[in-house]
A protein has these predicted regions:
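PLP-dependent aminotransferase-like
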Residues: 104-168
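Hydrophobic residues in well-ordered beta-strands that form the structural core
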Residues: 112, 133, 198-200, 363-365
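N-terminal small-domain helix-loop-helix segment of the aminotransferase-like
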Residues: 2-93, 137, 287, 386-389, ...
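Conserved core segment of the aminotransferase class I/II
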Residues: 226-300, 412
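Active-site phosphate-binding strand-loop segment of PLP-dependent enzymes
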Residues: 141-214
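Conserved glycine-rich beta-strand-loop-beta hairpin in the small C-terminal domain of fold type I
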Residues: 299-307, 314, 320-339
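Helix C-cap/helix->beta junction micro-motif
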Residues: 24-27, 127, 193-194, 316
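PLP-dependent enzyme catalytic core of the Aspartate aminotransferase-like
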Residues: 83, 341, 354-363, 369-423
């Protein structure tokens, strides 16, 4: 596979599309926004009160985060079968800067599942790394197919590359699926065999739709000595604008070296997470009942709406993995290629353009996610279909949120937009 080389900075495509939607809506256009993975939910009153109570935390604190905060985060990971001490934790203004700091800290090139979240590859390039995309298996996204990973490693090294960092997303953005435990075990063994550092982005972990039927195994349980886990509160609690991220580093020398490297980068970039946000983090990661109740309700809502969009895509003739976590679906319109080609739709860019121009549906084309640009795939984020704050609250409480008029109306527009592709 030909690696991608460093290039000039460009705006993040999902953020650029989000701003495009704002501009066009300001001009009076009616758009269905499926291109931005924001968990649009009302802020819990207890979170707002905690933020206000933390206003007096105005001084600079430790770069890694205050000890009380890191202790609560350590407890969160320990409750998820990842025994953790406060010294293994770093908190930051979102998980995105932590991922960038890891790219700057871990030597060598980067291996990514293809497709993948659109931020990993640009960060790697800014860090001067080559990026090697590896196809995902048929059953899920977020992880590379093991045989394909072995092939890419062999070919990259033969060509002079030095892949040492493997980034996984569990559950996955963009496919809304979760790698099964057997596959995670195989990849953990492969990472150990090939001496790869693993970064497991687990920011969607707590919004698996049905955790009793969808078991979660972290790479940190399989290869604990080489796995860094990142997470945050943006997806589970709808706090994207508050920018609270965390990282858990392995115990032992490797983990200490990686943690110290990230802290060094942090000291030059963000200094410390804002004090009031640390106050929020300590409260949220302690997981009092009101937090866990909200997360469960959010997972039910995300699951119901994502499954509805999945059904619409399949009914339209697309192939699509059933979503099991988060709020994404990743339809593949390859079965309709001949009919779409007759309308000038031959790749993901023209497919996304046709949906926008013909139906006001804003999606993120697969070519922006490291996927084959000739494929007819795109990501649809379903979490902005919940309406205004009052409607969001109603959706969280509803037995079937897809029957609420404001959500049903958006789903109907999506179905008509997909059908219009073939008119």
């Amino acid at each position: 596979m030909t690696p991608a080389h460093p290039s000039a900075p460009a705006p993040s495509p999902n953020l650029a599309l989000n701003q495009l939607v704002d501009r066009r809506r300001a001009r009076g256009e009616s758009l269905v926004h499926l291109a931005f993975g924001e968990a649009r939910l009302p802020v819990l009153p207890q979170l707002a009160a905690t933020l206000a109570a933390g206003a007096s935390r105005a001084a600079y604190g430790p770069v890694a985060g205050a000890e009380d905060v890191r202790t609560e985060v350590a407890g969160y990971f320990t409750r998820r079968r990842q025994p953790t001490t406060a010294d293994q934790v770093v908190v930051a203004p979102g998980s995105k800067p932590l991922l960038m700091a890891l790219q700057l800290t871990v030597p060598g090139d980067v291996l990514l599942p293809s497709p993948a979240w659109n931020t990993y590859a640009p960060q790697a390039r800014y860090a001067g790394k080559r990026v090697y995309g590896v196809p995902v298996p048929a059953e899920c996204g977020g992880v590379p197919a093991p045989d394909a990973l072995r092939t890419v490693l062999r070919e990259a090294r033969a060509a002079g590359g030095d892949p040492r960092l493997l980034i996984l997303t569990l559950p996955d953005n963009p496919t809304g699926t979760l790698a099964p435990p057997a596959l995670v075990r195989e990849l953990g063994a492969l990472a150990r065999e090939e001496d790869l550092v693993v970064v497991a982005d687990e920011i969607y972990r707590d919004i698996v739709h049905d955790p009793d039927r969808t078991p979660f195994l972290s790479p940190a349980e399989v290869a604990p000595e080489r796995t860094v886990v990142t997470s945050g509160l943006s997806k589970t609690l709808g706090l994207g604008g508050w920018r609270i991220g965390v990282a858990r580093f392995p115990a032992g020398d490797t983990g200490e070296r990686l943690r110290d490297g990230v802290i060094a980068v942090a000291s030059e970039l963000w200094s410390t997470l804002a004090g009031p946000m640390q106050h929020v983090a300590a409260y949220a990661y302690a997981e009092p009942p009101e937090i866990t109740d909200r997360v469960r309700a959010a997972a039910r809502l995300h699951g119901a709406v994502a499954r509805a969009v999945h059904r619409i895509a399949v009914d339209a003739g697309a192939a699509c993995r059933p979503p099991t976590a988060g709020f994404y679906v990743y339809p593949d319109f390859e079965p309709l290629r001949a009919r779409l080609a007759a309308r000038g739709i031959t790749d993901s860019a023209s497919l996304a353009g046709a949906l926008l121009d013909g139906s006001g549906l804003v999606v993120l084309g697969g070519h922006l996610l490291g996927d084959d640009p000739k494929a007819l795939r795109f990501k649809a984020a379903t979490s902005l279909l919940y309406g205004d704050e009052e409607q969001q609250a109603a959706a969280l409480a509803a037995d079937d949120p897809t029957r609420l008029p404001h959500i049903a109306g958006e789903l109907d527009r999506i179905a008509k937009g997909f059908a219009r592709l073939l008119d």
